[in-house]
């Protein structure tokens, strides 16, 4: 016999599964894993933009400053800010008539 004929057998009313009332630990574990997988898949599809954006940009916060003295942290912040600051003297203003 095939697995299909052993698990699902036609009855007088309709198709039924013999293992639906089973208390076999393997069946219970498979059911729990299946339900958890379905819930996680639904959550992933609902919130995938938020989740992957957080993973993509949330992890790029710069180097850790744990264990670094406050004076060095401030110096680092100033260096980063000075690298970002733009010198207005390098731009040419063009006035259209």
Swiss-Prot record:
Lipid attachment in record (S-palmitoyl cysteine): 50
Chain positions found as Phosphoserine: 64, 82
Bilayer disposition of the protein: Single-pass type III membrane protein
Intravirion compartment residues: 44-97
Transmembrane segments: 23-43
Keyword Oxidoreductase: no
Annotated positions for site Essential for channel activity, possibly by being protonated during channel activation, and by forming the channel gate and the selective filter: 37
Protein's GO biological process: protein complex oligomerization; symbiont genome entry into host cell via pore formation in plasma membrane; symbiont-mediated suppression of host autophagy
Protein family per UniProt: Belongs to the influenza viruses matrix protein M2 family.
Protein task: Forms a proton-selective ion channel that is necessary for the efficient release of the viral genome during virus entry. After attaching to the cell surface, the virion enters the cell by endocytosis. Acidification of the endosome triggers M2 ion channel activity.
Domain commentary: Cytoplasmic tail plays an important role in virion assembly and morphogenesis.
Protein name from the UniProt record: Matrix protein 2
Organism expressing this protein natively: Influenza A virus (strain A/Duck/Hong Kong/2986.1/2000 H5N1 genotype C)
Gene name linked to the record: M
């Amino acid at each position: 016999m095939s697995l299909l004929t052993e698990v699902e057998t036609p009855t007088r009313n309709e198709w039924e599964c013999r293992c639906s009332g089973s208390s076999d630990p393997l069946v219970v574990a498979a059911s729990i894993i299946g339900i958890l997988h379905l819930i996680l898949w639904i959550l992933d599809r609902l919130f995938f933009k938020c989740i992957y954006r957080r993973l993509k940009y949330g992890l790029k916060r710069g180097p850790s400053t744990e264990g670094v003295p406050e004076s060095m942290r401030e110096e680092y912040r100033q260096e980063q800010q000075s690298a970002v600051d733009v010198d207005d003297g390098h731009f040419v203003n063009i006035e259209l008539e």
